[in-house]
Amino acid sequence: MTEPNLDEDGSKSSFQKTVVLRDWWLIKCPKEFEGKQFGVAGFEESVETRAMRVFTSSPITKALDVFTLLASDGIYITLRGFLNKERVLKNGFNPEISREFIFGFPPCWERVCNSCFEGDSFGTDVNTVPSTIEKACPPILSPCKYSNRNLKDNPAESREKSNVTETDIAEINDKGGSGARDIKTARRRSLHLQIKRILESSKVRKTANDGDHGSEFLNTAKRGDVERDGCEVINNEDSEWKLDESEVQNLCNDGDNGSEGFIKAKSSDVEKDKSEAIDNDVISPAVGSGIKHTGADNVDKVTSASATGESLTSEQQNGLLVTTASPHSLLKDLAKSSKPEKKGISKKSGKILRSDDNVVDPMNYSGTKVKSAENKRKIDASKLQSPTSNVAEHSKEGLNNAKSNDVEKDVCVAINNEVISPVKGFGKRLSGTDVERLTSKNATKESLTSVQRKGRVKVSKAFQDPLSKGKSKKSEKTLQSNSNVVEPMNHFRSEAEEAEENLSWEKIKRKIDFDVEVTPEKKVKQQKTNAASTDSLGQKRSRSGRVLVSSLEFWRNQIPVYDMDRNLIQVKDGSETNSAPSKGKGSDSRKRRNLKIK
C-alpha cells in the first residue's frame, strides 16, 4: 500500500486520490495482492465539465466503513447507491451475495465473497446469467403442477422432482473450488428442499384424512393416485338427495291423512302454497268471520296456480275461481300488512292479509263450509251467481265477492252488514238482502259515463279494519264510531263549478303592459331644496342687467341654475341632489344617460 509522498517539513499540501461511484458492483481482479483478489467497479459520479467514466479498482485491502474502501494502489473509493445485481451475476457471483452487499460492504465481506463466488471472474455474456441463477437456486415445484387437478391428464411420471440429486451436488462441488464450504452449502440446500417436500406431502395426507369419514369413495381415492401425486380430489355432489315434486304434490293432495299430510308437505318445501292449519283447524276465507272448521274432511288446501309459474287452464272459463298470485306479490302483501291490528286486500294478488302474516284466500265471502279435499282449489260458479241468498243466511260472516277482472278498482265497504256502492251509492245505504252485486261491467271505466267518472267517490284499495275507528291515511272516506260514512267535500262537478263562478277572478287578474319596464318604480322623494333665488341672495347685476354669480362654496357642491335666456335663476346645493351614495365609477354617467333618454 502506497501512501502519498509528503515533504519532510510538511510545507506542501496534497490531495488524496478519491473516487465516488454512484452505481457499483463486485469484480474479481486478475492479479492478487497479499491474498486479496476482489475489487469494485462502477460508474463514477458525473461532473458537469467531464463525461461519465467507468472505474475499475485494484484489489480492496481494507473497508474503512460501509461506504469507504481502500484499494491496494492507495485510492479511496466512496460508494453511493445500491449494488447492481445484474452486473454482479455477470461477474460470476451468487445471487445470495446481494443480501449482504445491499448498499455497502459488511464487516465480514471477505468471507461472503469467497463463499458466493462461483467462477468466470473476468465477466461472462449476459445471456449466461439465467443459467447461472438456475444452477445456484434450483426451482421448487409444487406437487400438483396442473391447475385442473385431473389425475388422468396429469401423470406422475411427467413431473419434475423437487429434490437435489447427487449429480447436482457433484456439479456444484466441481465448480465451487472451495472444497468443504461448497459441500456444506449444497447439503443445506438439499436438506431444505427435502424438508419442504415432506411438509407438503404431510399436508396432503392430513387433508385426505380429515375428509375421510368412512366412505368408500375417499378410501379408493387414497389407494389410487392421490397418495402418489399429492393432489387432493374431493368431489361433492348433492343432486342425489333431491325430492321429486310429484311426490310432494301427492303428499299435499292426500286429504284423508288430516294433519299428517300438512306436516309432510311442510317438511318437503311446500310452505309457499299452503293455507294456515293449526290443530286441524282451518280459518275460513271470509273476512271477519273468525269461524274455524275442524276435521280432516273439511280441510281445504289452497294452492296458487300462478305461484309455480303455470298459466291458468280452462277451469277459469268454466266459472271456477283460482287464486292468481305470484310469489313476489305475496311477499309485498305480507310486508304491507305487517302493521298490527290491520287487515288489507292486496291490489295484485287479491289475498286478505292478517296481522299474523298468514295468507288467506278471499274466494268465498259467503262463509259457507269449506269443501272436502277432493274438491279443493275449486268453488262452484252457481254459488257465486246467487249471492243474495248466501248473504241473507250468513250476513254476519262477510260479503259476497263477485271476483272479476276489474272488481279491485271499485271495492265495496262493508260496515255493520250494510254495503255502500262506490259508484251509485253516494251515501245511500243498502241492507244485506238488497245488496247490489257489482260486476265487471259496472266496475270498469268503459261502462261509466263521463259524469259518473267525475262524480264518483274514490275508495282506497287498502281497507281498514271495520272495528277500528277514525280516519285512514289511504282512504278518502271517514269512518266514524256509528259506522256512518262521511263523504268528503266537493264530490260533484257542479259544486266545483259553482265555487269557480263565485271566485272573483277580476281581483286576481291584472293587465300586462309590455311597453312598461318590469323593474319596480322607486318612489320619488320630495326633497326640500335649499335653492335660493337671486332676489333673496341679493346678487349684484352687471351693466347689461345680468345677475353676477358670487363665489360658490365648492365643498357644498353648489350648482347655478339658468333659464332659457341664460339668466341665473337660483343656486342649488349639490349635496341634496346627490344624497344617495354612488355605487360605482359610472354612476354619474348612467344618470346623465337616463336624463337624455327621458
Swiss-Prot record:
Keyword terms: Cell cycle, Cell division, Centromere, Chromosome, DNA-binding, Meiosis, Mitosis, Nucleus, RNA-binding
Domain SANTA: 19-111
Tissue expression per record: Expressed in shoot apical meristem, leaf primordia, basal parts of emerging leaves, inflorescence meristems, young inflorescences, developing flower buds, developing sepals and pistils, styles and young siliques.
Regions of compositional bias (Polar residues) in chain numbering: 383-392, 527-539
Disruption phenotype: Reduced growth, abnormal leaf shape, defect in mature pollen grain formation and aborted seeds, due to defects in mitosis and meiosis.
Molecular function as annotated in GO: DNA binding; RNA binding
GO biological process, one term: cell division
Claim: Protein transport is one of the keywords in the record: no
One Gene Ontology cellular component: nucleolus
Localization per Swiss-Prot or TrEMBL: Nucleus, Nucleoplasm; Nucleus, Nuclear body; Nucleus, Nucleolus; Chromosome, Centromere
InterPro entries: Centromere_KNL-2_homolog, SANTA
Region (Disordered): 335-403, 445-500, 520-542, 572-598
Biased composition (Basic and acidic residues): 335-344, 371-381
Annotated region described as Required for localization at centromeres, given as residue ranges: 538-572
Task performed by this protein: Involved in recognition of centromeres and centromeric localization of the centromere-specific histone CENH3. Required for normal progression of mitosis and meiosis. May play a role in the determination of the epigenetic status of centromeres. Binds DNA and RNA in vitro.
Family assignment from sequence similarity: Belongs to the KNL2 family.
Protein name: Kinetochore-associated protein KNL-2 homolog
